[in-house]
């Protein structure tokens, strides 16, 4: 958050920053550093982990991953991410920026079965050329969802408002939305929140390797989370419908009176009134 300049997707959240990356080198031990950080995050009560990094190739190519290891259960870091989810956290991870390379697929830990993997689209909702693709080696839909990762507005280390590209930015955009949605439903599990997000996405019924399930609509996710099962009764009916003023409630012969309560889609009670056959309007 920057006053009068920038509001992120979870501006009132509390954050811990864990630096597990060795910027000068790329070695397998960094996966262990990440798992150690995830364990520490769990001990601190963290709900959502954002991971803006991924591992596939290492400086010593003998240790590099292969695509057949992107199965959600082989890489050390991915297994650590799965343990984090089993502890109740939501792990959000960048899909990777290798979409235009000879090895365009997702990297560790984006292959995780329970990890919410985020690819990148531009402001026109078109997948970027660099966004790594799926599926996982075992055929699961990856990435899971998409968020803006091209020309993302952000604050740099000096506090300047700039734009940048990468799934390293689409992932935290999504992680903030995840946190905000979970705040609306604090009693739901991490799996339930993830399911709400995926089922709200615009390609949920027709996913593919570039977009996964697509771009989530968090207003739909919120509505679905608040939803109740449809039901019908024959003891009364209301008219006119729709109305912007007075509404009449017609009770059946077996009902003489009752209490009518009206709730908004957010679950807030907006009206309550006793009604009867002699006083049927609200």
Residue spans for each PLM region:
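Active-site-adjacent substrate-recognition loops and nearby beta-strands
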Residues: 28-34, 38, 58-66, 93-113, ...
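Catalytic-core regions built around general acid/base machinery
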Residues: 71-88
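Hydrolase catalytic cores
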Residues: 1, 15-22, 47, 105, ...
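Subtilisin-like serine protease catalytic core
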Residues: 1-30, 44-47, 58-61, 86-88, ...
């Amino acid at each position: 958050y920057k006053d009068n300049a920038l509001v992120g997707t979870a501006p009132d959240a509390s954050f811990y920053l864990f630096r597990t990356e060795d910027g000068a080198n790329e070695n397998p031990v960094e996966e262990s550093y990440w798992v150690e950080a995830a364990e520490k995050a769990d001990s601190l009560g963290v709900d959502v982990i954002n991971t803006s990094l991924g591992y596939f190739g290492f400086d010593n190519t003998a240790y590099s991953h292969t695509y057949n290891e992107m199965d959600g259960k082989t890489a050390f870091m991915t297994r650590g991410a799965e343990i984090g989810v089993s502890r109740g956290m939501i792990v959000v991870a960048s899909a990777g920026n290798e979409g235009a390379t000879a090895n365009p697929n997702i990297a560790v830990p984006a292959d995780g079965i329970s990890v919410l993997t985020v690819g990148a689209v531009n402001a026109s909702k078109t997948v970027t050329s660099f966004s790594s693709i799926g599926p996982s080696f075992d055929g699961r839909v990856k990435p899971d969802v998409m968020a803006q990762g091209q020309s993302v507005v952000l604050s740099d280390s000096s506090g300047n408002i700039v734009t940048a590209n990468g799934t390293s930015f689409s992932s935290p955009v999504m992680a903030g939305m995840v946190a905000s949605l979970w705040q609306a439903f604090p009693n739901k599990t991490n799996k339930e929140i993830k399911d709400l997000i995926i089922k709200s996405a615009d390609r949920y019924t027709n996913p593919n390797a570039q977009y996964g399930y697509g771009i989530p609509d968090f207003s739909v996710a919120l509505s679905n989370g608040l939803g109740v099962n449809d039901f019908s009764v024959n003891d009364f009916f209301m008219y006119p419908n729709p109305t912007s003023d007075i509404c009449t409630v017609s009770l059946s012969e077996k009902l003489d009176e009752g209490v009518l309560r009206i709730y908004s889609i957010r679950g807030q009670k907006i009206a309550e009134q006793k009604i009867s056959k002699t006083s049927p309007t609200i």
